[in-house]
């Protein structure tokens, strides 16, 4: 009956159940006791394990359904069937009537949407509440505050923008962050050769407006770097100067994407002569960014489910730690998919 994993698990379950319930009390009573001092019993242990398993099972089901919707079959609003990857790349149904409409979706519904959310909601909402005097409200407004993983989650959100813009997934970005992102002066130091695909938004924009491409790449990296500069954990440093700097940089990126990049792409590449180029970018985006991310999501959430089930059946410190580590691992593709919350993930809720 080791205290470490029992106390940690009881805290995790208390906060998770509080967040998922309709109870607005930020301090649920956990059955009449302080969360740290919950009584251990075989009944409690079984309930906690079952709760973890059901949450992991739902995550696994969602990840599987999402991946299958892109690669196997998806029913759109008009009742058309087919893999969503085909619908997007070939503009066979729904909102995509041209290659340009796909690129617009990538910019506004994808990249702008998450840049704006990180700056204007994920950082600004807690900051506004906290600095207005509602410190408890500010704390509870922090996404992922109970796992102390907010800062890395937000960084991965920005990396999802980078992957979309570059048309390729960076396979070592997280490891470079772990080595200290402040060590890199700019995206030029951070990027590896070949990170930017030939058929990408970056290459297309650079071919006609290299200064704009430079500004986009600079702000993407600056946003990630500013987020990583927030003292860890974010929940304990909501009102820091670094938090304000990160919020402002992300909003600057969002404004650039919506107010300059999207109009520029429409005006410059709206002629049908660019359709083949835009088609190639859409295909590269789906095949090299979306599908690998969702495949990774499916695989990692299956591993998480297996680990949680193993812990449920054989409670131990080692099995608990394995489940915790796999939960953190499974978070990465979730967060890195947020620059393409389009199609099935939006329509299926």
Predicted regions located by residue number:
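Mature extracytoplasmic or organellar-lumen-exposed domains after removal of signal/transit peptides
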Residues: 22-349
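Hydrophobic helical h-region of N-terminal Sec-dependent signal peptides
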Residues: 8-13
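Bacterial N-terminal signal peptides that target proteins for export
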Residues: 1-7
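C-terminal motif of bacterial Sec signal peptides marking the signal peptidase cleavage site
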Residues: 15-19
């Amino acid at each position: 009956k080791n205290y470490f994993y029992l106390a940690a698990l009881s805290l995790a379950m208390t906060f998770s159940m509080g967040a998922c319930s309709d109870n607005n009390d930020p301090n649920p009573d956990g059955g009449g006791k302080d969360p740290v001092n919950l009584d251990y019993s075989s009944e409690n242990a079984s309930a906690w394990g079952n709760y973890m398993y059901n949450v992991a099972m739902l995550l696994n089901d969602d990840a599987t359904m999402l991946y299958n919707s892109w690669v196997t079959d998806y029913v759109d609003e008009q009742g058309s069937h087919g893999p969503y990857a085909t619908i997007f790349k070939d503009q066979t149904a729904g909102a995509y009537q041209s290659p340009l409409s796909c690129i617009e979706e990538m910019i506004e519904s994808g990249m702008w949407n998450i840049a704006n959310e990180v700056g204007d909601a994920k950082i600004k909402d807690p900051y506004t509440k906290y600095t207005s005097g509602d410190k408890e409200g500010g704390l509870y407004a922090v996404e992922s505050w109970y796992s102390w993983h907010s800062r890395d989650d937000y960084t991965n959100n920005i990396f999802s923008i980078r992957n979309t813009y570059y048309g390729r997934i960076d396979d070592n970005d997280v490891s470079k962050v772990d080595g200290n992102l402040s060590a890199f002066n700019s995206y030029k130091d951070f990027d590896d050769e070949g990170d930017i695909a030939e058929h990408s938004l970056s290459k297309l924009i650079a071919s006609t407006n290299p200064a704009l491409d430079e500004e986009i790449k600079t702000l993407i990296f600056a946003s990630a770097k500013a987020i990583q500069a927030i003292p860890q954990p974010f929940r304990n440093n909501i009102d820091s100067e670094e938090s304000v700097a990160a919020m402002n940089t992300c909003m600057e990126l969002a404004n650039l994407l919506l107010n300059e990049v999207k109009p520029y792409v429409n005006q410059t590449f709206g002629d049908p002569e660019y359709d083949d180029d835009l088609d190639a970018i859409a295909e590269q985006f789906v095949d090299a960014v979306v599908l690998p991310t969702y495949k990774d999501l499916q695989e990692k959430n299956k591993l998480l489910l297996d680990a949680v089930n193993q812990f449920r059946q054989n409670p131990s410190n080692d099995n608990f730690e394995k489940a915790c580590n796999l939960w953190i691992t499974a978070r990465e593709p979730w967060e890195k998919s947020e620059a393409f919350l389009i199609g099935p993930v939006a329509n299926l809720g």
